């Protein structure tokens, strides 16, 4: 069967996705060589808005894109995927233009792969930072066999989060992220395998979640007062799983990246953080260590 012409693809309707599209979304991820991640798709479709184009051959979805709105302050864009058999036929550009028109009024942010960056630049996005994805088996000792370097956390302790911590988490997150993520954070207890908070003399100074993605466990979001608190949260989360870890670390946090390398997490890939409608991301970058997932920020 021959592929539809670019002209016929341009006429395919763009529709809203819902939780009934979980399997087709996961199939599309698999088609592009990504983990299926139905668990993550479920969260993204409930907390955000999915856009899709049905494949003209009747086999699932030809393309997807997802937005997560944080009020008028920011909208995250992600999961721009096109089935391999429809690649390089203008679908991604058309879908992104529709999303940008629909989300008009709020600044946009996304994490771009090297493959996707030229499209985003053509559409007016500008690079504002980078993120380093690292992954691997967590080891409690360094490569020499001696205990890995650990920053002093003095009076900081971490523990599993409770429902009573949500408001303090939201306040800390608003400072770090610069936009209200309440609707996302409220879903973390059900979504995560583990949600951990850090305290210093009764004050909440950080939080992080651990959630499953295929054979790996992902750390994110990670918001912390400083690198020492971030490391304490990751260390205690790592102790709760036997899976390899994965985390997308904002590139400016070189000290944390060095500590993670010492614990066995190696570079996997890099993405470019890009924005549209704003010259920089809101919030306090010094406290923002890792996104929940690049698609949601």
Which ranges hold each PLM region?
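Conserved N-terminal entry element of GNAT/NAT acetyltransferase domains
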Residues: 1-19, 137-163
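Intrinsically disordered, low-complexity, positively biased terminal segments
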Residues: 1-8, 18-19, 23, 56, ...
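Glycine/alanine-rich phosphate-binding loops at beta-alpha junctions
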Residues: 2, 6-55, 60-69
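A short helix-loop-beta-strand connector motif used in the catalytic cores of GNAT acetyltransferases and
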Residues: 37-56, 60-63, 74-76, 107, ...
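A structural microfeature
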Residues: 62-63, 129, 206, 269
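Conserved hydrophobic beta-strand within the GNAT/NAT acetyltransferase core sheet
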Residues: 77, 108-113, 247
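Conserved catalytic-core motifs of GNAT/GCN5-like acyltransferases
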Residues: 107-111, 126-140, 267-279
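Conserved active-site tyrosine of GNAT-family acetyltransferases
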Residues: 120-125, 260
């Amino acid at each position: 069967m021959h592929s539809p012409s670019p002209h016929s693809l341009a006429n395919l309707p763009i529709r809203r996705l819902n939780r009934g599209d979980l399997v087709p979304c996961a199939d599309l991820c698999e088609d592009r060589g990504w983990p299926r991640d139905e668990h993550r798709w479920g969260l993204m479709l409930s907390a955000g808005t999915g856009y899709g184009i049905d494949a003209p051959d009747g086999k699932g979805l030809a393309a997807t894109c997802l937005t997560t709105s944080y009020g008028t302050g920011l909208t995250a864009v992600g999961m721009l995927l096109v089935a391999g058999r429809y690649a390089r036929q203008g679908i991604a550009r058309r879908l992104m233009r529709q999303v940008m028109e629909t989300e008009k009024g709020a600044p946009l942010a996304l994490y771009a792969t090297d493959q996707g960056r030229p499209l985003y630049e053509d559409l007016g996005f500008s690079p504002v930072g980078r993120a380093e994805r690292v992954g691997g088996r967590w080891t409690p000792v360094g490569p020499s066999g001696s205990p890995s370097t650990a920053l002093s956390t003095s009076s900081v302790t971490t523990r599993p989060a409770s429902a009573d911590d949500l408001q303090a988490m939201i306040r800390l997150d608003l400072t770090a992220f610069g936009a209200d993520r309440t609707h996302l954070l409220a879903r973390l207890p059900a979504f995560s395998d583990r949600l951990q908070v850090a305290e210093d003399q009764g004050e909440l100074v950080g939080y992080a979640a651990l959630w499953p993605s295929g054979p790996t466990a992902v750390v994110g979001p990670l918001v912390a007062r400083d690198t020492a608190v971030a490391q304490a949260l990751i260390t205690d989360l790592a102790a709760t799983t036997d899976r390899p870890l994965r985390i997308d670390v904002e590139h400016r946090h070189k000290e944390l990246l060095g500590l993670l390398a010492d614990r066995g997490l190696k570079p996997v890939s890099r993405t470019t953080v890009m924005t549209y409608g704003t010259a920089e991301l809101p919030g306090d970058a010094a406290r923002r260590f890792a996104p929940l997932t690049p698609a949601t920020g």
